[in-house]
From Swiss-Prot:
Pathway(s) served: Mycotoxin biosynthesis
E.C. number: 2.3.1.-
Gene Ontology molecular functions: acyltransferase activity, transferring groups other than amino-acyl groups
Glycoprotein listed as a keyword: yes
Topology relative to the membrane: Multi-pass membrane protein
Gene transcribed to yield this protein: PaAT-1
Protein name: O-acetyltransferase PaAT-1
Membrane listed as a keyword: yes
EC category: transferase
Source organism: Phomopsis amygdali
Protein keywords: Acyltransferase, Glycoprotein, Membrane, Transferase, Transmembrane, Transmembrane helix
Main location: membrane
Length: 497
């Protein structure tokens, strides 16, 4: 990410090297002068249509971005199904029922499994650079990275959230939110934030709720049933944001652990990390911390194996094609097994009687509910992908990488859009086409989904470019400006770029 100060100095250098050409010179060289209207409208262009931008090079962990993008897409689909269909499509599969309920396929309309995947990815991503620097003996640099991450983490998560939910408060005053009575029979009625008498009361209510939502200390740690977390941690202006306080608290605990153990011998650190993960899950059912620490452990294991391979003498791979095929078969088997375990129906809604899951569900203690098998399956999925690069191609394609880039913005905007545009379109298409038969209803919802997804992708892309990236750049800039030099330990040195 280019910092603001660095980009300014780069522009200065460019202008010194190549003086600006006059309009006459540009016309002579058949260069059309810039169009002001095009410049102003340029901010509305989605990032994928800007052909001048070079394609981002893939790196060793790019598949994590793609996996995050696919999971974010499935979460949006899940929330759409809750507002456009009844609970029946999320029930366990039984012979003769819809194919959408089948294992693996049901992940396309599920929500909880992808939340677990998000948290494993977050643990891996936050740990990767500090662990890599620590293993290289660059402890000061690792400490600097951790310090920067801790400083910027709250702003990284909550500044874009505050900006988006501010517009939710405005939309509430404009009566853009739908009412539950217009869509009967759906699993979750349309959500409407608190509606106050005037704009000033609305903004005051928004400000207080936002401050409570961003509380870095008083929020409860994710424990037990995620359904209870939704009730305790949700933002009144967007109920899907309940995972952000969980993400913040879990990331702070992980970063504190990394800071404490960055200088510890690698295998000892891995042993402590494993012990902490087991303790969090088995004794306290802190499933979010379990997932974050497991993500860190997977990352540390990958770096450990990389070091072991680098110390070996170079030799030709003499394995036969049958051994290669066997290794790939193991990878595919673990991948499919992880997806099947992630597809476990909610035990409280008939999952213990679902075909194929009866024996497995009977082995899970009651106290864990759904917070044992699916988290372990999410860990298994990331672990499998990390050690079988041939499977990573599923998440390094252009679509997955693009969805990964806009995943946080997509997460922020889809809830408000679903409860305003998605709800209104659903009512109007049903009124136009009819919802008296299943076929008519599906046609109406399909048209609704097409328009909703188009607008959601465009808005998410806009928020990604001008809110998400900007908040990252500003937080980095602020951190750099507040740093003090080691030569003057008692005075703050304001850095000029």
């Amino acid at each position: 990410m280019i910092e603001l100060g660095q980009s300014y100095s780069t522009i200065q250098a460019m202008t010194k090297q190549k003086p600006l050409k006059s309009l006459r010179q540009r016309v002579k060289e058949n260069q059309t002068p810039p169009n002001r209207s095009q410049n102003h409208l340029g901010i509305l262009r989605p990032s994928f249509s800007q052909h001048s931008r070079e394609r981002k090079m893939l790196h060793s962990t790019s598949w994590l971005d793609g996996l995050r993008g696919i999971s974010a897409t499935c979460v949006v689909v899940h929330h759409c199904t809750l507002q456009w269909f009844g609970w029946h499509i999320h029930e366990p599969w039984f012979p003769g029922q819809s194919f959408l309920k089948l294992p693996v396929i049901r992940l396309l309309i599920s929500g909880s499994p992808h939340v677990y995947i998000f948290f494993v990815i977050s643990g891996y991503s936050l740990s990767y650079k500090p662990l890599k620097l620590s293993r290289q003996g660059r402890f000061d640099e690792a400490a600097s990275v951790l310090s920067s991450s801790i400083f910027r983490r709250h702003a990284r998560l909550f500044v874009p959230t505050t900006i988006v939910t501010f517009f939710c408060a405005i939309m509430t005053q404009l009566n853009w939110y739908g009412k539950a009575e217009h869509m009967p029979g759906v699993a979750v009625p349309a959500w409407e934030p608190p509606h106050l008498d005037n704009i000033w009361a609305q903004l005051n209510n928004f400000a207080w709720n936002e401050l409570l939502f961003m509380d870095p200390v008083g929020r409860t740690v994710a424990k037990g049933d995620p359904g209870e977390q939704v009730k305790q941690l949700h933002n009144p202006y967007d109920y899907v944001l309940w995972t952000l306080p969980v993400e913040f608290n879990s990331s702070m605990v992980l970063l504190m652990f990394l800071m404490a153990f960055s200088r510890v011998e690698s295998r000892a650190r891995m042993a402590f990390c494993l012990a902490m993960a087991v303790l969090f899950q088995c004794f306290f059912i802190y499933w979010a911390l379990f997932l974050f620490f497991s993500g860190m452990l997977i990352c540390d294991l990958r770096l450990e194996l990389g070091e072991a391979l680098s110390t070996r003498a170079p030799s030709k791979d003499t394995r036969s094609w049958s051994k290669h095929l066997f290794v790939r078969a193991i990878g595919v088997g673990c991948f499919v097994l992880s997806l099947c375990a992630l597809s476990t129906p909610h035990l409280a809604f008939g999952g213990r009687e679902a075909p194929g899951f009866v024996t497995l569900a009977s082995m899970i203690p009651e106290r864990f509910g759904d917070q044992l098998l699916m988290p372990i399956a999410a860990i298994g999925l990331v672990l499998t992908l990390d050690h079988h690069p041939f499977l990573q191609v599923l998440f390094t394609n252009s679509f997955a990488q693009y969805m990964g880039r806009i995943s946080f913005a997509l997460f922020l905007v889809h809830g408000p859009l679903l409860n305003t545009l998605g709800h209104a379109l659903g009512r109007r298409f049903i009124a136009l086409i009819g919802g008296d038969t299943e076929e008519r209803y599906l046609v109406a919802i399909s048209l609704t989904a097409m328009v909703f997804w188009l607008m959601t992708i465009l808005l998410a892309d806009f928020v990604y470019q001008y809110v998400d990236l900007a908040s990252v750049q500003v937080s980095k800039w602020a951190y750099q400006r507040l740093l003090r030099t080691e030569e003057q330990p008692g005075k703050y040195e304001w850095k000029s770029r």
